[in-house]
Structures are given as C-alpha cells and as structure tokens.
Amino acid sequence: MSRSLKKGPFVADHLLTKVENLNEKGEKQVIKTWSRASTIIPQMIGHTIAVHNGRQHVPVYVSEQMVGHKLGEFAPTRTFKSHSKGDKKARM
C-alpha cells in the first residue's frame, strides 16, 4: 500500500536541510546519510548522497529517473558470493 498523497513523501529533516542549503549556495558536495527510508525528491537531482548500507557509505548520484524511489534501493546491503564451480548440488 502506498503512502497517502495528502501526507507527501517522507524525507528526513536533516537531509532536506542539507540539500536545500547546498542548492542555495550552488555547491555540489557529498552528503552522508543513514536515512535509507527517505524518498528521493526533485531538489536532490544532481547531488551525490552517500547512503549507509550497514558497513560503509555507498555514493549514489541522483538522476531524474530516481525521483520517487527510496535512497536504500540504491545501496545494497547484502553481497552475493557465487556458488562454487565444483558443487553440483547448489547449481541445480
């Protein structure tokens, strides 16, 4: 179920103020955040946001196609180690 339109998208307050301050100054700077649940809004386009994946901050360059998605979608939390070549059970 999607979020109500009258509420609007969720964006963490500290992240929104940092983006607005950089937009006023006209600067492009990496913004570090732990807020994976924040929705990408049009004001974030062109910025690089370092999203925490549980271990490190993954840099995410925000483009127009990302608007409406969550920041956490672009910072994977799990790494897949491939199945071993000799193990036939895992491949079937």
UniProtKB/Swiss-Prot annotation:
Record-annotated membrane-spanning stretches: none
Gene3D superfamilies: 30s Ribosomal Protein S19, Chain A
GO biological process, one term: ribosomal small subunit assembly
Keyword Cell inner membrane set for record: no
Keyword terms: Ribonucleoprotein, Ribosomal protein, RNA-binding, rRNA-binding
Function: Protein S19 forms a complex with S13 that binds strongly to the 16S ribosomal RNA.
NCBIfam families per record: rpsS_bact
UniProt-recorded name of the protein: Small ribosomal subunit protein uS19
